[in-house]
Every structure is written in C-alpha cells, then in structure tokens.
C-alpha cells in the first residue's frame, strides 16, 4: 500500500489560519477576496513569559500567493498550525 505525505490543500475560499513555533505566532486573515484579487493580513506576535497573550509585533498585507508561500515556508521550518492565540478585531 502506498501512503503519500501530501500537504493539506489550500482552501479556495477565505479562511483564517494560525501558525506557531511555540514562541512566535502568525495569524492569517483574509481582508480582500475578490475573483481576481485576494489579500490576507498577516499579524505577527511573540509570547512573553509574563503575558496572557502574545505581544503583537507587526501587521502586513500579503497577496494570496505570498501568504501561501509564507505558510509553507513556516511549516517546512517546523511551525505548527494552532488554535487562535488572541481575539482578532472584527472586519468592518
């Protein structure tokens, strides 16, 4: 029996995602999802020993392709998908 180790499929519809290496956290959130133009907001945070939630360090917008590349790069580097690490603000 052949068992393949395929990566999970990238969703075609917008979805939030979280990655962590245990100290740093990335939150991927779709902000523009039109047929020909998709962007995600990526927020980076870092856990500090005396804090209840990660310290938010940086926020940037990436194209869908850039976000997918970053996600795959982090997974290859040992990061893991995780549950939400903070309550992100609601979309307007």
Protein language model features and the residues they cover:
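Terminus-proximal functional modules
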Residues: 1-92
């Amino acid at each position: 029996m052949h068992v393949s180790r395929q990566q999970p499929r990238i969703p075609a519809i917008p979805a939030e995602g979280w990655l962590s290496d245990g100290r740093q956290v990335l939150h991927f959130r779709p902000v523009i999802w039109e047929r020909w133009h998709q962007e995600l907001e990526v927020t980076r945070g870092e856990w500090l020993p005396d804090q209840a939630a990660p310290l938010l360090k940086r926020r940037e917008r990436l194209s869908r392709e850039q976000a997918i590349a970053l996600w795959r790069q982090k997974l290859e580097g040992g990061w893991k998908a995780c549950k939400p690490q903070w309550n992100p603000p609601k979309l307007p």
